[in-house]
Amino acid sequence: MIHTLTTYESTTTDPYENLAVEEYLTFHVKPGECILYLWQNAHTVVIGRNQNCWKECRVSELEADGGHLVRRLSGGGAVYHDLGNLNFTFCMRKEDADVSRQLQVIIEAVGSFGLTAEKTGRNDVAINGQKFSGNAFFDSDGYYYHHGTLLLHVDTASMSRFLNPSKAKLQSKGVDSVRSRVVNLSSLCPDITVDTMKQAMFAAFSKVYGLPAMPLCTEHLDLDAIQKGRERFASDHWKYGQKIPFTNRLEQRFSWGEVNLDLHVNERQITEALLSSDSMEADWFSDIGTEFQGLPYRTDILCKALNRSLEQHLVPADIRADLCQMVQEQI
C-alpha cells in the first residue's frame, strides 16, 4: 500500500541523463513509496526497448538536425519529444502498482483545466478520441515504473518528419509503433503551459492518493551512479546495437532506369547488399553492391563508399548524383 508520496523535477533536458535518473529513482524507491518524476527532453525520438530504430524514425536525418535517439527500458512504440512535451514517471514497487489509479492522476490534472479526458486503447489517454498521452511500463526484480507523455504544444511537423520512416520497404522483426491521432492540450485550453501542467500534476498526485507529497532534492541522488547510467543510455551499443536484423529496400525510378538496393543489416552493420537495375548501364551494378558488405549502416559512410566506387567504375556524373541522393533520402 502506498503511504509515502515523493516528487522530483528534472533540471536538464538531456534525454540520456533523464532516463538515467528515471532508472535510478525506480531502483531506489522504498516499499510503500510512489515517486512522481517530471522531465522534458529536447529534440528527441525515444524508441521502445525492442524496437528497430531504423524502422521507427529517420535516424540519420534526426541526428544531422542535432536531435537525439534514445532507447528506453520499457517496451511500446516510438515517440517524439521536444520542449512542448512534458513527461511523467510513476516509480514504485511492483506490488503497489495500480494503472487505473496512476492514469487517474493524469485525468485529474487535465480535468483541473476544464477538460474531460479518458483512458482509451492500449493505456493511452485522450480527449474526444484524440490522444495526448501515450503510456508504457517496466518492471524488474519487483521494481516498477509507469511513464508517459503529455503533449502540450509539441511541434507536430517535427513529429511527423522524424517519426515517419521513408517509403522504402523496410522489413523487420522489431515492434511497430501504433500511429494515432494526437492533439496538443494547449490547443484545447490556452491556460495549459509546461509550468501550469507541472503544478496540476503535483496537485492531482496528492489528491488521487490522498497524501501530501514531499519534494526530493538533487543532493540526495547518487550523481556518479546516474552519470554511469547516462553513459550507457548514450552509447552506440545501447542505441543501435540491439540484435534486430532487418532488410531495407531502397528503390527509385530515374530517367535512365529503375534501381533497387536491398541492404541486409544486423547490429548496425551491412551483412549483404544487392544492387539491381534495368538500366542499359547495368554492367557495374553487381560490383557496387558487394562493396557495401561489412560497412556500418550510416548514411555518410555509405554515400562516401558509393561515390568512390561509382567514380572507380567511371559511372556518369548524373547517375552518380542520382544514386547518392537516393541513399541520402532513404536511409
For each feature predicted by the language model, list its residue ranges.
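Structured beta-strand/loop patches that form or line metal/cofactor-binding pockets in enzymes
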Residues: D222-N266
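FAD-binding core of FAD-dependent oxidoreductases
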Residues: R72-N87, R122-N128, A136-Y143
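Short beta-strand elements
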Residues: A136-F137, T149-L152, Q252, V259-S277
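Long, positively charged amphipathic alpha-helical accessory segments at protein N-termini or as interdomain linkers
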Residues: I106, G114, S133, D141-Y240, ...
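Contiguous, small/hydrophobic- and glycine-enriched helical/loop subdomains that border
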Residues: N85-N123
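A generic structural motif
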Residues: M92-D96, S186-D191, S277-E281
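Short, glycine/charge-rich beta-strand/loop segments that flank catalytic centers
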Residues: Q40-H43, K119-G129
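N-terminal lobe of the biotin/lipoate ligase/transferase fold
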Residues: M1-A97
